[in-house]
Regions:
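Metallocofactor- and cofactor-centric catalytic cores in central/energy metabolism, strongly enriched
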Residues: 1-69, 73-86, 99-106
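Conserved anion/nucleotide-ligand pocket segment
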Residues: 91-93, 97-149
Length: 149
């Protein structure tokens, strides 16, 4: 709200581009907006992730929300209900913006050009936290449940 006002924006879109969160399984608290709001008021961090709080706040402010990580976040009946109620779009499960994207694009090209690949080595030269986050068992579980690792 403050950003929108300070920058004289007519509209904003909230885009989540943080690292993969700790795995949060779909639970009763995600089945309806009332249950989600109750869990949020009770600060139930077992079922409410930080990204869910950001998504909820964005929707409440009529700002579309795009989930760029493989987190549960907006992929719940409660968020769908809130989005529909406010007529605010939500989308996304994973940008596939790093190594996965490169491999998804390059591998078919190599095959089409009949280029054999004996191995694949990649380095994260930018040093983001994804590998460190994936070393955490609960985060790795979240990523694996939402993608093709």
């Amino acid at each position: 709200r403050d950003f929108k006002a300070a920058n004289n924006c007519d509209r904003i879109v909230v885009l989540w581009a943080a690292s993969t969160e700790i795995y949060v399984p779909l639970s009763d608290e995600h089945q309806s907006l009332a249950a989600l709001e109750k869990a949020m008021k009770e600060n139930n961090t077992e079922v409410i992730s930080p990204s869910m709080c950001y998504a909820y706040a964005a929707i409440a402010e009529d700002a579309p929300f795009v989930m760029g990580a493989p987190n549960l976040c907006v992929d719940t009946p409660a968020m769908w209900e809130f989005s529909k109620q406010k007529n605010v779009p939500i989308s996304g499960k994973d940008f596939k913006s790093g190594q996965t994207l490169m491999k998804t694009v390059l591998a078919p090209m190599f095959k089409t050009r009949m280029l054999g690949v004996n191995g694949w080595f990649s380095t994260n030269v930018l040093g983001n936290r994804e590998v460190k986050c994936l070393m955490i068992r609960t985060t790795s579980r979240q990523k694996k449940s939402a993608s093709c690792l």
